[in-house]
Regions:
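OB-fold/S1-family RNA-binding modules
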Residues: 49, 93-98, 138, 231-248, ...
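Basic, low-complexity terminal or inter-domain segments flanking catalytic cores
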Residues: 2-3, 25, 80, 117, ...
Length: 672
């Protein structure tokens, strides 16, 4: 008897259909020789600290840290007990299990932690697929993998979970307790990924706040060759420039302008035209999709992930979204006709576009050597109904579809010309791009990347030694600009490119080869967590750090805020997933690191400024702002020993004193 274990009910129903498992049960579907059941994400979670000893329960205490479990314990989530009972019972009735959860590290953990917890001893196989359309399910069911092929992926997932738990439980408690000592009532959460991400935003905000605009200068001459006028920019000598090669000496600029106005002609020093061919953009990875959606529509990263997941799971119009790869395996070229047929079936208006595609053209996207666990996000062979998509879902689907269709269009060809000129002994340069063949770019229209900026001036034919007329010159006074604040897309890009934040060459090399901070599946959630914790705030499309977030980064040790070190842990998890590092070795290093951080944190005072707060009306101590069912209030930091509270805004409130006595009073406290 075989049991197919899926990650979610919709996935289970899709697979059950192919297996003839049509008989409905409570939390499962069954058929001849097979039963299909499902989790609902993680049904198990790491036990709370008090399970490892009552000394780790509430109230939190600094002296018992660090908490380093020797025997890790899982418990069934409170809201998952019913479905867990179903799976546990079914596992006792079968001798073979097919893991059919999502094809990634987290999907592996969801299934295998259940099998381990329930002590399943039978045979295990893996169903591995990147899409939930009919053809993909059929192909995967006919090619089940042995369990051993993905077992190391499970250990990597467990290592990630335990590492996050160790850092979160130990360091959040430590710094929250240290914060209370100086009047900070908030939970100062610390995370292996969230803290370096917060530090990235804090650093950018600091650069913006401390930025001082400086003037710089340009000279733009208007030249003409054979009657055709065009602009050319002065190239100042190095001694007149800052480190960015911007001229910062206005007196020199004025002299050059005057020189140009007194010089009627110049000479062409050199003129080169190069025909450049540009390939279509690759299929999307999750992070590149999040960046594009942020750029075009200002979508938060978590929203993009949710939409991509729904397009994959519910509508079945696109492939698996949590991928870090933009390439496709060569074998998938066989599916091109079916995919294009489904695209037209879903949106008949695309028939004229699809008719002009060259499906024999082999773009750079087809590359087996670049494939990771999953290929890029593309349309599936499933014909859907556009009318059932929300506006945001339709936008994301069309963007994914556009990148796939572009693979069958010609390369974009541009004639890029660069010419230099001598005007009175001064060097001037101009550049121009002329699109010779739009190729794939013709599909994009307004969806062309906003970042693509270039000089589109049409330059006349010219050659070295040719005379040019100087028709005029003007000085431009410009100001340096501060860096832009992060938004969801640019922060996702920064998390992916952690190498930009380190200077050590060896570490930079490692980070470039790795996926940066976090994973494709977790980055959006990290940003959302930082917002919910009050460390980041959304200002229109921008993400800005709050005073609390900046203060926290300022007082934490650099080992916690350094993106490079965090990315190294992800690199080691990749080694675990590849079977080159054991889970025990990974956890031993992680435990040693956490122990060092706890010891360091205990020995140093927390130099953080608490926000202004009213005094406790009972004991006179400090209070912290809390949120209750009826709004905010201020509670004594000596709680539960002292139960004094003050209503937010100083309104009349009942104050709970020591021993629970009621002390009606009116307080008018102004916070400055």
């Amino acid at each position: 008897m075989r049991l197919v274990l899926c990650e979610k009910p919709s996935q289970g129903r899709d697979i059950a259909k192919f297996l003839g498992a049509t008989q409905r049960g409570d939390g499962f579907l069954s058929g001849p020789g097979v039963t299909v059941t499902w989790a609902r994400g993680h049904l198990l979670e790491t036990a709370e600290p008090e399970v490892y000893g009552e000394q780790y329960g509430k109230p939190w205490r600094t002296e018992v840290l660090p908490l380093l479990p020797q025997q890790w314990k899982l418990v069934v989530k409170a809201d998952a007990k019913a479905q867990f009972a179903v799976i546990n019972r079914l596992l006792k009735q079968v001798d073979e299990v097919v893991i059919a959860t999502d094809a990634d590290r987290e999907g592996e953990v969801i299934a295998r932690e259940l099998l381990d917890y329930c002590k399943f001893q039978g045979r295990i196989f893996r169903l591995w697929m990147s899409a939930l359309d009919d053809a993909s399910i059929r192909a995967a069911l006919s090619d089940l993998w042995p369990s051993s092929r993905t077992e190391a992926l499970y250990y990597a997932g467990v290592g990630r979970s335990r590492a996050d738990w160790l850092i979160g439980m130990n360091l959040t408690r430590l710094f929250t307790l240290k914060g209370r000592e100086v009047g900070i009532g908030n939970v100062l959460s610390v995370g292996r990924v969230q803290t370096p991400t917060l530090a990235i935003v804090v650093q950018r905000d600091s650069e913006i706040e401390n930025f001082v605009a400086k003037p710089y200068f340009e000279v733009i001459a208007t030249l003409a060759v054979n009657g055709a006028a065009f602009p050319a920019k002065w190239v100042p000598a190095a001694q007149y420039c800052d480190e960015e090669k911007r001229c910062i000496q206005p007196g020199v600029v004025a002299q050059v302008v005057q020189l140009c106005r007194q010089t009627p002609t110049g000479a062409v020093i050199d003129c080169q035209t190069e025909r450049k061919k540009q390939s279509a953009p690759l299929a999307f990875s999750l992070s590149s999709l999040q960046q594009a959606c942020s750029r075009h529509w200002g979508m938060p990263a978590q929203t993009v992930l949710d939409i991509a997941q729904k397009l994959y799971e519910t509508h079945k119009l696109t492939s698996y979204p949590r991928t870090d790869c933009g390439y496709l395996p060569v074998s998938m070229r066989e599916e091109i006709p079916q995919v294009l047929s489904a695209v037209v079936g879903t949106d008949p208006a695309l028939q004229p576009v699809v008719a002009q595609l060259d499906t024999q053209f082999v773009s750079r996207i087809w590359n087996d050597k670049k494939i990771t666990a999953h290929h890029g996000i593309i349309p599936t062979k499933h014909t859907g109904d556009l009318s059932k998509l929300s506006d945001e879902e339709r936008n994301v689907y069309q963007l994914v579809r556009l990148h796939y269709l572009a693979q069958f269009m010609p390369l974009m060809e541009v004639d890029a010309t660069e010419a230099t000129f001598n005007i009175g002994g001064q060097l001037f340069r101009t550049r121009g791009n002329v699109v010779v063949k739009a190729g794939w770019k013709s599909l994009f229209g307004k969806m062309a990347d906003d970042d693509e900026k270039g000089d589109e001036a049409v330059l006349p034919a010219m050659q070295a030694g040719q005379v040019c007329q100087v028709q005029g010159a003007e000085q431009k006074v410009l100001q340096t600009k501060p860096p832009a604040p992060y938004n969801d897309g640019t922060l996702i890009a920064a998390m992916t490119n952690a190498a930009a934040f380190v200077t050590d060459a060896a570490l930079k090399k490692v980070l470039k080869e790795n996926a940066g901070i976090g994973t494709e599946a977790t980055r959006a959630g990290i940003i959302d967590t930082l917002v919910k914790r009050g460390f980041l705030v959304r200002e229109k499309k921008a993400l800005r750090s709050t005073p609390l977030g900046r203060s926290l980064v300022d007082v934490l040790p650099g080992t916690l805020t350094n993106p490079g070190l965090t990315a190294l842990w992800e690199q080691m998890l990749d080694e675990v997933a590849a079977g080159r590092v054991s889970l025990d070795d990974f956890m031993a290093k992680q435990s040693q690191w956490v122990s060092q951080l706890v010891a360091q944190g205990k020995s140093q005072p927390l130099a953080i400024q608490a926000p202004p707060s009213p005094p406790c009306p009972v004991c006179g101590g400090k209070t912290s702002q809390r949120k209750g069912k009826k709004g905010s209030f201020w509670r004594c930091l000596n709680y539960p020993d002292c139960k004094g509270i003050v209503g937010d805004g100083g309104n009349a409130k009942t104050l709970q004193g020591r021993g629970g006595s009621s002390l009606p009073t009116r307080l008018k406290i102004k916070l400055r």
